[in-house]
A protein has these predicted regions:
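Conserved core of the sugar-phosphate nucleotidyltransferase
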Residues: 125-203
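N-terminal glycine-rich phosphate-binding loop and ensuing alpha1 helix
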Residues: 3-62
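Hydrophobic/aromatic residues located in beta-strands of well-ordered beta-sheets
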Residues: 17, 58-60, 115, 145-146, ...
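Active-site donor-binding loop signature of nucleotide-sugar glycosyltransferases
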Residues: 38, 81-83, 120, 168, ...
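Short beta-strand segments
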Residues: 20, 117-119, 148-149
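Short, high-confidence coil segments that cap the C-terminus of an alpha-helix
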Residues: 55, 110-112, 140-143
């Protein structure tokens, strides 16, 4: 798909996607390449993310040679970043600068670009989830960033500190996030709490 000088097709901002992944996950080392139904988890994410129809560019972002070799084996782009990043979004930020400064996008970094992070451990993601975080940014340039949130209907997930919950106001603006079980009702968990968790898809 060709890019115009103004950005993406028909002059819209470019939509640039990154799938950050690393082998040294503290809770599950080697998780990105762990097989699910005989296919590495990361490949499930790639296949599903690629179904979104409006990418101007989509690539892996990693510091691991093993993941780069996997990407080369399936013919998928991969950007090598530093190994010092603690957060996936920091890796994505570096990867974007590398991609935007290369000939891959043409025209260099652009403040109008919409940068999307699809976490490499979300094998059940769907292309409409990408649209859910991208569409608000395309519609309103005053929105700085978006994150996908999912309702929690399971008490164990609500109590799990590995699950990041969020609280937002009525306008949908995130007020704060926590690994604690929030919001917390007087009688503990119930679906009426409308607790929500962060799903690993972000855009900014």
């Amino acid at each position: 798909m060709g890019l115009s000088e103004m950005g993406g097709p028909a002059g819209r901002p470019r939509v640039v996607g990154f799938i950050p992944a690393r082998m040294a996950a503290s809770r599950f080392p080697g998780k990105p390449l762990h097989p699910i139904l005989g296919v590495p988890m990361l490949e499930h994410v790639i296949r599903r993310a690629a179904m979104y129809e409006h990418w101007d560019y989509l690539t892996l972002a990693t510091c691991d040679g093993e993941i780069r070799a996997f990407a080369e084996g399936i013919g998928f782009p991969c950007v090598m970043t530093g190994d010092h990043h603690v957060r996936a979004l920091d890796r994505v930020a570096e990867a974007y600068e590398l991609v935007a400064s290369s000939d891959l996008l043409g025209g260099g970094p652009n403040d109008d670009d919409v940068v999307v992070c699809v976490q490499g451990d979300e094998p059940m993601m769907r292309p409409d989830m990408v649209d859910a975080v991208v569409a608000p940014l395309l519609a309103d340039t005053g929105i700085p960033a978006t994150v996908l949130a999912m309702h929690i209907v399971d008490e164990d997930l609500w109590r799990n500190p590995d699950t990041v919950k969020l609280i937002s106001n009525q306008a949908g603006e995130v007020l704060y996030t926590s690994r604690a079980p929030i919001p917390h009702g007087r009688e503990g968990f119930s679906e009426d709490l409308m607790a929500r968790r962060i799903y690993g898809i972000f855009a900014f």
